[in-house]
Amino acid sequence: MSNANSFTKEDLIACGLGKLFGPNSPRLPKDNMLMIDRVLKINGDGGEYGKGEIVAELDINPELWFFDCHFAGDPVMPGCLGLDAMWQLVGFFLGWEGAEGKGRALGVGEVKFTGQVLPEAKKVTYKLTIKRKVYRKLVMGIADATMEVDGREIYSAKDLKVGIFTDTTSF
């Protein structure tokens, strides 16, 4: 387990290259698919269930790539990118705890969208609480999460599942 409880954008980029937690740790996506600019807080015993929590942010500006293509004349951040960020953070949490292998999203129990991220927004905040951690042959994290834009909750997800696999050939 890492002793760090916050991470910069540079740290997150290093995670995508296998240089933060080690070469065999789960990696974050690189470049445009990395939907996180910083992790403000991560711990292994906090949150609603006492199994861990993560708070992270993404800075929003009108120049972000997705505003140009989603949609013409009606720019909005795709909801799937916010959901993917939540999965990214569950995988990051498992790597932070020392899991080794490749992270894969395994599903989500429920997702609700009650708002949107427009180019005028300034900041997205992700808040995850870990519900369950499995460290057996299968390593898996299950979390509940919310996403806020400029302090207003607009997405919620229950039972986000991420698995860490040492072999993905049969996945």
UniProtKB/Swiss-Prot annotation:
Q: Where is the active site?
A: 70
Subcellular localization, as worded in the UniProt entry: Cytoplasm
> Part of which pathway?
Lipid metabolism; fatty acid biosynthesis
Highest taxon in the source lineage: Bacteria
UniProt keyword annotation of Nucleus present:
no
Catalyzed reaction equations: a (3R)-hydroxyacyl-[ACP] = a (2E)-enoyl-[ACP] + H2O; (3R)-hydroxydecanoyl-[ACP] = (2E)-decenoyl-[ACP] + H2O; (2E)-decenoyl-[ACP] = (3Z)-decenoyl-[ACP]
Q: PANTHER family under this entry?
A: 3-HYDROXYACYL-[ACYL-CARRIER-PROTEIN] DEHYDRATASE, 3-HYDROXYDECANOYL-[ACYL-CARRIER-PROTEIN] DEHYDRATASE
Role noted for this protein: Necessary for the introduction of cis unsaturation into fatty acids. Catalyzes the dehydration of (3R)-3-hydroxydecanoyl-ACP to E-(2)-decenoyl-ACP and then its isomerization to Z-(3)-decenoyl-ACP. Can catalyze the dehydratase reaction for beta-hydroxyacyl-ACPs with saturated chain lengths up to 16:0, being most active on intermediate chain length.
Q: Which family does it belong to?
A: Belongs to the thioester dehydratase family. FabA subfamily.
Q: How does it assemble?
A: Homodimer.
Supply the name of the protein.
3-hydroxydecanoyl-[acyl-carrier-protein] dehydratase
The encoding gene is fabA
